[in-house]
Design a protein with these regions (language model features):
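Residues forming the Rossmann-fold NAD(P)(H) cofactor-binding site
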Residues: 96
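Conserved GNAT acetyl-CoA-binding A-motif
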Residues: 106-120
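Glycine-rich phosphate-binding loop
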Residues: 93
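A short, internal acetyl-CoA/4′-phosphopantetheine-binding micro-motif in the GNAT/acyltransferase core
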Residues: 83-90, 119-120
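Acetyl-CoA-dependent GNAT
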Residues: 5-77, 81, 86, 99-101, ...
Length: 120
């Protein structure tokens, strides 16, 4: 597995990310991203220049999970949003590795704090 920055150059990867949002949240928060288009809208927002957008890929380049971050307070604080892992690979530590990588990305950008909102 490798974790990389998603730059939005691969339309197929963006569609995989959008579908992951729909699939990963369907059971516990079905109103989050109900359609592929709603997922694509979120992915486009994740790819804005000031944000963090990282993907975990398997050896074949298929999407296993993703994590995003939104800078706040001049980049001193980062909101972790969203985090999603393919349901069929839950329990393998992919989410944990994405969060550890996210912490490194925030630190490299001078961030001091990471928040996780629950108001959505």
């Amino acid at each position: 597995m490798q974790i990389l920055t998603c730059d939005g150059q691969n339309e197929g990867m963006m569609r995989q990310m959008a579908q992951l949002l729909v699939d990963a949240f369907r059971e516990h928060w079905p109103e989050a991203w109900r359609t592929l288009e709603e997922g694509m809208e979120e992915v486009r927002e994740m790819l804005e220049a000031e944000r963090i957008c990282r993907v975990a890929l398997d050896e074949d380049g298929s999407l296993l999970g993703m994590i995003g971050g939104i800078p706040q307070y001049d980049g001193n604080v980062w909101e972790l949003h969203p985090l999603a892992v393919q349901p069929h690979v839950h329990g393998r530590g992919i989410g944990r590795m994405l969060v550890l990588d996210f912490e490194t990305q925030v630190r490299q950008r001078g961030g001091l704090t990471i928040t996780l909102g629950t108001d959505d």
